From Swiss-Prot:
Reactions catalysed: 2 D-alanine + ATP = D-alanyl-D-alanine + ADP + phosphate + H(+)
Annotated positions binding ATP: 177-232
Keyword field contains Cytoplasm: yes
Matches recorded under Pfam families: Dala_Dala_lig_C (PF07478), Dala_Dala_lig_N (PF01820)
HAMAP family hit by this protein: Dala_Dala_lig
GO molecular function, one term: metal ion binding
Source species, domain of life: Bacteria
Locations listed in the record: Cytoplasm
EC number: 6.3.2.4
NCBIfam families: D_ala_D_alaTIGR, PRK01966.1-2, PRK01966.1-4
Organism, scientific name: Listeria monocytogenes serovar 1/2a (strain ATCC BAA-679 / EGD-e)
The protein's name in its UniProt record: D-alanine--D-alanine ligase
Length: 370
């Protein structure tokens, strides 16, 4: 019997359109001999709309933008529901057929543990990270504490609460200027995109950046700016994760001068070099830190680890992303493609990992014996 793969995409997020592109890519990469593709679209307003079961490839992304005016019928477990009709999240519940949810959502309500909690309550297997890893990695302050506890090197940073900023602004600025040197980067603690992030090169810019960041969160992290290469690595697995080859993001206008790479991908003004050239000892450190971060978060399925590597070979883990970009041209799938795992096979592996984790969870005891 085919596995029913529920694709959950859209959402109340600044990355709504990216999520649609991701769903389009995943659906068109699915082996429909193995999977039954069941799309569920979450509108910008947060309404859940169930689409038709898909029997072939899509031609346009817009085919996934369902609305309440659609009238095509879709057979469900014991009744029929109109495609385009608003539904309850309970539609995710398995109906006897092997079912897995693939959440293709980004940012708040998508990769912060909230929708993952829904899947846990429904006891349905789902691709990617659980509640703990998702929520901890979304919060930059909590994430940094976990990495520090694991002994993973990070750039210096200062965490600031809004109430402290309001009451002790001068003292907070003095503390930051004592610990950090300009330039610094000011980031809301709990946003998954670049919204609210600013670079500050002096005190006035720092104050302005803090004011901007506090519009989006009541907690802010201020990080030391470094001149470094940006190198990323994919991690895949559950209890025994493995790492991909490293990839590098070249800044706008940079020219690739590397000898040893299999592929160079160009996206607007950003060049991706995969695999990139890294000293073998540094590469082993990078793998070690990526796996330590993965296990420290109790991650599962997939994680992308983002590093800084300075000219004098100082290595810093900047952050991890528990739901990285997932179109065929995004860094994470490209890293695995160049490691030997193509896009379609990567999707199938993630579904298998979801099933494995769910089976392990259900094998646990949840009540005391009489």
């Amino acid at each position: 019997m085919k596995t029913k793969l529920i694709l959950l995409y859209g959402g109340k997020s600044a990355e709504h359109e990216v999520s649609l592109q991701t769903a389009f890519s995943v659906i068109n990469a699915l082996d429909l001999e193995k999977f039954e593709a069941a799309p569920i679209y979450i509108t910008n307003e947060g309404e859940w709309i169930q689409g038709p079961l898909l029997s072939g490839k899509l031609d346009f992304v817009e085919q996934l933008r369902f609305s309440a005016t659609d009238t095509i019928k879709l057979a469900t477990t014991e009744s029929e529901k109109s495609e385009g009709e608003a539904i309850s999240p309970a539609v995710l519940e398995a109906d006897g057929q092997e079912t897995v949810v693939f959440p293709l959502l980004h940012g708040p309500n998508g990769e912060d543990g909230t929708v993952q909690g829904l899947f846990e309550v429904l006891n349905i297997p789902y691709v990617g990270n659980g509640v703990l890893a998702s929520s901890a990695a979304m919060d930059k302050i909590v994430m940094k504490k976990i990495f520090a506890d694991a002994g993973i090197p990070q750039v210096p940073a200062v965490a600031v609460r809004l109430i402290d900023w309001k009451n002790y602004q001068e003292e907070m600025v003095a503390e930051m200027e004592e610990v950090l040197t300009y330039p610094v980067f000011v980031k809301p603690a709990n946003l998954g995109s670049s919204v609210g992030i600013s670079k500050a090169t002096n005190k006035k810019e720092l104050v302005d950046a803090m004011t901007e960041a506090f519009l989006y969160d009541r907690r802010v992290v201020v990080e030391q700016g470094v001149v470094a290469r940006e190198i990323e690595m994919g991690v895949l697995g559950n209890d025994t994760p493995v790492c991909s080859v490293p990839g590098e993001i070249l800044p706008e206008g940079a020219v690739a001068t590397f000898y040893d790479y299999k592929a160079k991908y160009q996206d607007n003004n950003t060049a991706l070099i995969i695999p990139t050239e890294v000293d073998p000892e540094i590469l082993e450190q990078m793998k070690e830190y990526a796996i330590q971060a993965f296990l420290g978060l109790d991650a599962s399925g997939l994680v992308r680890a983002d590093f800084f590597l300075t000219e004098d070979n100082q290595l810093f883990l900047n952050e991890v992303n528990t739901m990285p970009g997932f179109t065929p041209y995004s860094m994470y799938p490209l890293l695995w493609q160049e490691t030997g795992l193509p896009y379609g096979a990567l999707i199938e592996r993630l579904v298998d990992l979801a099933k494995e984790r769910h089976a392990a969870k259900n094998a646990l005891k949840y009540k005391l014996e009489d």
